[in-house]
Every structure is written in structure tokens, then in C-alpha cells.
């Protein structure tokens, strides 16, 4: 993947636009997410490991909001179930084009990988096939809050017995002191990764109108309301977490 450093918010902007997954973001996305999301590499690689435990023969593995395909690549590295395929979908043209390039490169380096389709489209309009693994890796937080339950219900309806949804999200906290502490620690993480206070502030202004995090309890209750039987947190680093939801 590209090693271009993220300097998108390094200079003062007269007006900070809403964050969008456009060509500028795609160009620096690997650097951006690694320096912004604590534990991201561990989540992605272990998502592949977890998926291998839930994948069922002759089913689909979905990567919803696939961005550059890091999760898709992890699924293909770890899952060996017969007859499975990966369907990766994103609504950003720039992301989809670059994702296809990266997956073609993966094809040239490895043999016996799962077949994959990369689709440009809206996950809210997706016609789900029978699935054993669905990954929502930092995607649900960009879906309008009033549309989240319906999406999760459709995912639950597509999951076969023994399958799982793996949901990774930034969290907010209902306790003000806890929320303030973990927010400050996240800022410290970004500073330690080379972001200036200006970059942090401008990125926050850009993203706060388009990303709406939920609390862990809100996720749990929504997943249960969508028909999942069990919700198990398996990873948390600061205010970022990943959950396994079982049908």
C-alpha cells in the first residue's frame, strides 16, 4: 500500500470541509488510519483469524465499507472454507478503484486465495446472499443513526447458523469523566504519531458532522434488537473497540 504521509490538515484552512473519502483521502489513507486509530493493524489481522473460525462452506464473506480492502485481504489470507467468496463494497469511487489495485497485487503474490468481488455501491441497498461472516470495520459510525438498526437486521437475516458479524467502531462514553479521559488519551496517541494540534483540531472539525459514534451499550442493545443472540467484545484500545455478534 501507498506510504504517502497524511498531511491533509497540516496547513490552516479558512473553512474546514466535511470529511469525505475522496481521492485526497485515499492517497494517504493507510498512513492516516494507522496514526489515528489505536490498535487498527491488530484488529484487521485478527479479524481474519476470527473469520476463519466462523466461515461456513459455500457462503459469502462480506466486507461492508471496505475502503482499501485491508479487511478483505485479511479474510483471504486466513479463510480456507470450500466454496466461499468475499464481497467487498464501498460507496467511494476512489476507494473502490484503489482497492481493486491492491487486491490484484495480492493475487500476484499468493495462490489459493478466496475469489473476491469489489462493488461500488451503497451497503444500505445491498441484496445480501447467505453469509457466514460480515465485517463492519469502522463503517456503521458513518451510517445515519436512524438507518443502523434496519441494516443490522438485514445482516442478521443473511447470516447462516454458526456465522458472525464482526463490528469495529469508535466509542463514545456516557460517563463524562470517562469520555473526557479517553478522548484526551486518544489525542495523546495522535500527537505521539506525529500529528500537530492544528491537524488534530481540523480533522475533528471535518469529521464530527459525518461520523456519529455510539456507546458500547447502545451497540449491544441495537444488536440484540436486530435479532442477534449474543454480543461479545473481543478488542478495545482507548475509545476504539470491536465486537462479535452471534445470530
Curated annotation (Swiss-Prot):
InterPro entries: CmoA, Methyltransf_25, SAM-dependent_MTases_sf
One GO term (biological process): tRNA wobble uridine modification
Positions bound to S-adenosyl-L-methionine: 40, 65-67, 90-91, 122-123, 137, 204
GO molecular function per UniProt: carboxyl- or carbamoyltransferase activity; S-adenosyl-L-methionine binding
Broad class of enzyme this protein falls into: transferase
EC id: 2.1.3.-
Protein family: Belongs to the class I-like SAM-binding methyltransferase superfamily. Cx-SAM synthase family.
Function: Catalyzes the conversion of S-adenosyl-L-methionine (SAM) to carboxy-S-adenosyl-L-methionine (Cx-SAM).
HAMAP family: Cx_SAM_synthase (MF_01589)
Full protein name: Carboxy-S-adenosyl-L-methionine synthase
Annotated organism of origin: Pseudomonas syringae pv. tomato (strain ATCC BAA-871 / DC3000)
Amino acid at each position: 500500500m501507498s506510504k504517502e504521509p497524511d498531511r491533509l490538515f497540516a496547513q490552516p484552512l479558512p473553512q474546514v470541509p466535511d470529511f469525505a473519502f475522496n481521492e485526497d483521502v485515499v492517497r494517504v489513507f493507510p498512513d492516516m488510519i494507522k496514526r489515528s486509530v489505536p490498535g487498527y493493524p491488530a484488529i484487521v489481522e485478527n479479524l481474519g483469524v476470527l473469520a476463519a473460525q466462523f466461515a461456513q462452506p459455500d457462503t459469502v464473506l462480506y466486507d461492508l465499507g471496505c475502503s482499501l480492502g485491508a479487511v478483505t485481504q485479511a479474510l483471504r489470507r486466513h479463510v480456507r472454507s470450500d466454496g466461499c467468496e468475499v464481497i467487498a463494497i464501498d460507496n467511494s469511487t476512489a476507494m473502490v478503484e484503489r482497492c481493486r489495485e491492491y487486491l490484484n497485487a495480492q493475487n500476484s503474490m499468493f495462490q489459493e486465495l478466496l475469489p473476491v468481488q469489489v462493488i461500488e455501491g451503497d451497503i444500505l441497498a445491498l441484496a445480501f446472499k447467505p453469509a457466514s461472516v460480515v465485517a463492519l470495520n469502522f463503517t456503521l459510525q458513518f451510517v445515519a443513526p436512524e438507518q443502523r438498526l434496519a441494516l443490522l437486521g438485514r445482516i442478521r437475516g443473511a447470516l447462516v447458523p454458526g456465522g458472525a458479524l464482526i463490528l469495529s467502531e469508535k466509542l463514545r462514553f456516557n460517563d463524562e469523566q470517562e469520555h473526557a479521559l479517553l478522548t484526551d488519551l486518544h489525542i495523546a496517541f495522535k500527537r505521539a504519531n506525529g500529528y500537530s494540534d492544528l491537524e488534530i483540531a481540523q480533522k475533528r472539525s471535518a469529521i464530527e458532522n459525518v461520523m456519529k459514534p455510539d456507546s458500547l451499550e447502545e451497540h449491544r442493545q441495537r444488536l440484540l434488537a436486530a435479532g442477534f443472540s449474543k454480543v461479545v467484545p473481543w478488542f478495545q484500545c482507548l475509545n476504539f473497540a470491536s465486537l462479535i455478534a452471534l445470530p
